[in-house]
Amino acid sequence: MTKPTTMAIFLVLALSIAQLLPSLVAGTGRPRVIIVGAGISGISAGKRIWEAGIADVLILEATDRIGGRMHKQSFAGVNVEIGANWVEGVNGEKKNPIWPIVNSTLKLRSFRSDFDSLAQNVYKDGGLCDEAYVQKRMDRADEVDKSGENLSATLHPSGRDDMSILSMQRLNDHLPNGPSSPVDMAVDYFTYDYEFAEPPRVTSLQNTVPLPTFTDFGDDTYFVADQRGYESVVHHLAGQYLNADKSGNIADARLKLNKVVREISYSSTGVTVKTEDNSTYQADYVMVSASLGVLQSDLIQFKPQLPSWKILAIYQFDMAVYTKIFVKFPKKFWPEGAGREFFLYASTRRGYYGVWQEFEKQYPDANVLLVTVTDEESRRIEQQPDSQTKAEIMEVVRCMFPDEDVPDATDILVPRWWSDRFFRGSFSNWPIGVSRYEYDQLRAPVGRVYFTGEHTSERYNGYVHGAYLAGIDSAEILINCAQKKMCKYNVGGKHG
């Protein structure tokens, strides 16, 4: 046999072995792990699993992109964030793990949000409210919130004494319905609903006051306004273990887009995942990073049905809706300058187009305002035409600025996270009456089915850093089973 022939055979064999290597490593012709969802939790989990030496991972994503609820969209000539927007919890003793990626690694444009001058930016029908009066009401609200922190610290760890934030407010202010004047409702909405996307009457006091995100990482928040999008954080993480093309886009056979998972079957020997296009995938384990809203819907069927304790944990928690409505105008009519970025509308109808933000720094000359609504207002607005929403907004801004020549808005962008079957909401909120033990049941695996997502982060649910850390934590649980045969999972957080 000639040397060229020998070399050719060697190259063919080497190529064949290289192509088979992932299957040989796994011991089967199937991937070790399937990850459902390519948001930051799924991508973070995949990265940690890969770092542990389990390279044979397959990611199935329902949409045509990665990033999940971190998603930029073009509007008024700029890219705006219709989902996650802030790095929340910065400049504290501990470092928020997302902040170095945003600020140092990727150097995304971000701006510290200044809420300190809010008292001078509260509007009613007819113009500005009296600043001294608003400040007095805000000071009182801060006193009540501080009393809530003190009360929260005394509650039994089991959660048996937990109460809603509204109940705490009643105790401290002796008001049967909580804050009820337009200014008090506006301040209350900004304090709680703007953070949790649900009202104080349903939100757990013990598990949200004070918020670990801010006690751990600091009180500052930074608004990401970069044309690459906040989602570039997810692309950065994915690029550390998935291949990319020359343009930097993820182009790896281990990531399959437009794969809508509809069924997950599991047994003691493996899992089978079926998608809407009739594709079938098998693996040793599956990591489900779908949102809490999706788990509460009928999009994914589990066979056999998940045990009752798991189903109860899923349905006990709230999937909140947080809607950021962007509005484009032909000219500016609102105040700008230091201390003017955020302003409130004190309506007799709580949460009615209540929190506004102008973008003098973030998107100069774009003439865009952002108004945020939540909960029932979000659901109502998602179900009506954008033209109706625009008309309602125009009525509000003309009431706030009666002395200005307010032109008609030229464009509007209304995200619809609640209506989207791949999300069914914006982020999770911790409701009254659910213990840490029950929360940990959300994360707990069922056989070879593992779960991750911001809703599985007991300490930081609802936040980007919570989703990122949850991916790592859930991956560690899977790795312990796959590599160390430590498959028994003890639900933590239970107290007597």
From Swiss-Prot:
Subcellular location, principal: secreted
Superkingdom of origin: Eukaryota
Any one biological process term the GO annotation gives: thermospermine catabolic process
SUPFAM superfamilies with a match to the protein in the record: FAD-linked reductases, C-terminal domain, FAD/NAD(P)-binding domain
Pathway where it operates: Amine and polyamine degradation; spermine degradation
Glycosylated residues (UniProt): 103, 150, 278
Induction trigger: Induced by salt stress in shoots and roots. Induced by treatment with jasmonate.
Enzyme superclass (EC): oxidoreductase
Signal peptide: 1-27
Cofactor: FAD
A single GO cellular-component term on record: apoplast
Co-factor binding details: Binds 1 FAD per subunit.
Record key words, sorted: Apoplast, FAD, Flavoprotein, Glycoprotein, Oxidoreductase, Secreted, Signal
Binding residues for FAD: 61, 69, 261, 454
Compartment list: Secreted, Extracellular space, Apoplast
Pfam families, sorted: Amino_oxidase
GO molecular function: flavin adenine dinucleotide binding; polyamine oxidase activity; spermine oxidase activity
Family assignment from sequence similarity: Belongs to the flavin monoamine oxidase family.
Record function comment: Flavoenzyme involved in polyamine back-conversion. Catalyzes the oxidation of the secondary amino group of polyamines, such as spermine and spermidine.
Record-given protein name: Polyamine oxidase 6
Organism of derivation: Oryza sativa subsp. japonica
